Amino acid sequence: MKGPIKSIVLGALLACTLFGAISSLRAQAGRGDWTIRKSEQPGKIIFTLIISDRHNRSNHEVEEPLGDFHGVDLSKPGKQNVEFTLARDAGKFECEGFLHDGEGAGVFHFSANANYPQAMRALGFEGIDSEKQLEMAMIDVSLEFAKEMKAERLEGLDTDKLIAFRIFGVSKVYIEELRSLGLSAADSDKLVAFRIHGVSPEMIRYLQKAGYTPDEDTLVAMRIHGATPEWMDEMKRAGYDHIELQEMIGFRIHGVSPEFITELHELGYKRPEPEQLIAMRIHGVTPEFIKDMRSHGMQDLTIDKLVSLRIQGID
């Protein structure tokens, strides 16, 4: 695994670990607070679990079908006291509190499923202590989800990656769609990086239609640096179509923009080579610099000469 991808995923897993650490503040007691509010999606509600102490606070919000909350009736007007449960494979959230016209709050107690760690261990997922089990219940790491991911034969898949998959949205459907587009989609770290940075099937289809066959590291780098399909369309209109993806990434890193290209065109530089544009940005050859050199009587300046002047310290 290459350095940038590894750093990205380690950061993501650190975020997951931090989530678990914060959750552990009250995990021994398995208690916390909850809120409910209406969702814009018919038949669903937005349910938030809150774990906190004097120093830290951790929220986890999910949008779930109303039918998953046994004991909640949103059809009743006014204020009502409620007791309901939300069952997960990892355990059950037993909640009590109040609702008022479809919104409410209260406290919960988490009852861990004693069989869950053993069932997960049988699938190859180790290290599930009480804190991690609460976290896995909150984000709904089900046995079925674990089986689905194991069946995909992914490299580096462990309990923490499984948690990261649920947090960032790596699913069986997502993996299979990537594979249908020709990617191996076999590395757990890269799949997490894909979701963090927004590598989508739509983006891959756009690139393939444009004649590219990007590898997974290039896709992540494009998203990190903002080489989006929309930006690539702008570059195409500026006259830069079908250039290498690494050059596109270089454009974004060094600030080669459609506006920069237009200004150069107005100064007589019709279509500089991609590597020339990058060199100009690296060394600070700006339209203003070109105009200044011309005002001092320097004419017929090629791009290579301009770059050389800047390297020599002429400003």
Give residue ranges: language-model regions.
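General marker for long, soluble alpha-helical cores
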Residues: 2-7, 11, 19-315
